[in-house]
Each structure stands twice: as structure tokens, then as C-alpha cells.
A protein has these predicted regions:
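Switch/communication elements of ASCE P-loop NTPase nucleotide-binding domains
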Residues: 1-104
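Short, surface-exposed amphipathic charged segments that create phosphate/polyanion-binding patches used
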Residues: 90-94, 154-163, 207-219
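Conserved helicase/translocase motor-coupling segment
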Residues: 110-186
Length: 238
């Protein structure tokens, strides 16, 4: 706590000194700060102000910091051969909501954009299983998942295209029960994205029950009953 208090005093004194300057530089802005203190520091530096009294350049690997900023305030910096390339997140359309909901993804190198929360859970479950078998985790390799909301089949491809423009490697995992617009899918693939889906006309739950053995289905139902109760599971089956 003494360390945090000391850091907080240093941060505030830095801000006071910077108030009379035009530029402030901060490396790893989240270091030593609890989330609510980090949010307050960013506010103090003008994260929510429209004016430009102080120009701040800072680095961060914190999703908490990213959520406190607008897309126009965030830049992705990558090394390409012998140079660095800087891309402004706000230059990409329809990105602000993704920054708020899936801030962790912007700190990754490779992203799996999932149609909904079920696909995210499925991917994380497989990753955990493979990790327990001795394979390197997707997260350890710099990967992240994005939940596109599951509302429209085009949505995950549109979000995937937006992330491609920022230099991320992107894979879309989508259901096949509601076909997306072909031109949207083609634009995503033309930009370098990849996608996987189930067999024709199937969603995740369809594919699971068509692919699992009888014993596997029994285990899946037993797990559902254990979590949600027999009555609720029975109502959904009806």
C-alpha cells in the first residue's frame, strides 16, 4: 500500500508539473495502480476532455486502460521488418464498441472472432483441454477471443475485417444455420482473414449432438443438469 501511495503521489505531482507543459510521456501507465486509480489518473490526464491542453503519449498493456479511452486515442504499434508502423484504432469504422467489450483482444497478436458467447466458451474449453495435455495455450501464444454478440451472421466477419485493418491475424468462428452475406465474407477473406464453420445448416449445438457419441451426449446432459437443474434442461429439450 505504501508503494501504491508513493506511486500515486508521484503520478499526481507529475500531472501538476505537466499542466504547465504541452507534452507528457508515461511508460506502462497502469504500473502499480489498482483499476479505479488507473481510471482516475487517465481522467486527470484529460482522457475524457475534448480540449487539448496537454498531449500525452503513453504505453499500456492493460485492458482497463484501453476501456477508459476512445478509439481515437488508441494506436497500435507494430514492428515490420526494419521499421515500425502505427495504426490509429479510431480510423476503423465501428470499432468503439469492440474496444469497450473486448479490450483484451487489442493486446493480442492473433484473434478468434466468435459469433457468440457459446463459441468463445467452446474455444476456451478446447484450449484448456489441450493445455492440460501438454500443448502450449492459445493465450500464451498471444491469442484472444472476441464475442461479436451473436445477433447477425455478418457481424463477426465485419468485426474481423476491422481487426485485419489494424494488423491482427484473425480467424472467424461462425455458425452455419444462418448464412452470412457472401460479399461480406469474401471481403474478409480478400483482406487476409480466415474462417471456420460447421456443416451446412448447423449451429454449434447441432454439430455437438450430431458428432458426439451416445456416451458423450449423456455426459453433456449430465453436466447441464448439474449446472442448471433437471427441470430447466428438460424444458429446453421439449
Amino acid at each position: 500500500r505504501a508503494l501504491l501511495l508513493s506511486y500515486w503521489r508521484w503520478a499526481m505531482s507529475t500531472w501538476v508539473r505537466a499542466a504547465s507543459a504541452s507534452i507528457a510521456l508515461i511508460d506502462e501507465v497502469e504500473y502499480g495502480l489498482e483499476p479505479h486509480r488507473l481510471a482516475r489518473l487517465l481522467d486527470s490526464l484529460g482522457a475524457k476532455d475534448d480540449g487539448e491542453l496537454l498531449q500525452t503519449f503513453m504505453t499500456s498493456h492493460s485492458p482497463v486502460a484501453l476501456r477508459e479511452l476512445t478509439a481515437d486515442q488508441v494506436f497500435v504499434v507494430r514492428t515490420q521488418l526494419d521499421r515500425h508502423r502505427v495504426r490509429r484504432v479510431g480510423a476503423v469504422d465501428d470499432i468503439q464498441g469492440m474496444l469497450r467489450k473486448n479490450a483484451e483482444a487489442f493486446l493480442a497478436k492473433s484473434i478468434v472472432v466468435c459469433e457468440g458467447a457459446s463459441e468463445v466458451g467452446f474455444g476456451r474449453g478446447l484450449d484448456q483441454y489441450w493445455s492440460n495435455k501438454g500443448h502450449t495455450s492459445f493465450f500464451a501464444l498471444g491469442g484472444a477471443y472476441v464475442d461479436s454478440g451473436g445477433s447477425e451472421p455478418d457481424r463477426c466477419f465485419e468485426q474481423g475485417s476491422a481487426l485485419l485493418k489494424l494488423g491482427y491475424r484473425v480467424l472467424v468462428l461462425a455458425d452455419a444455420d444462418k448464412p452470412p452475406t457472401p460479399v461480406v465474407v469474401q471481403a474478409f477473406h480478400d483482406a487476409g482473414g480466415e474462417s471456420v464453420t460447421w456443416r451446412q445448416g448447423r449451429a454449434l449445438e447441432d454439430e455437438l449432438f450430431h458428432s458426439l457419441s451416445d456416451e458423450g451426449i449423456d455426459e453433456l446432459l449430465a453436466k447441464a443438469i448439474d449446472i442448471h437443474g433437471r427441470d430447466l434442461v428438460n424444458d429446453h429439450i421439449k
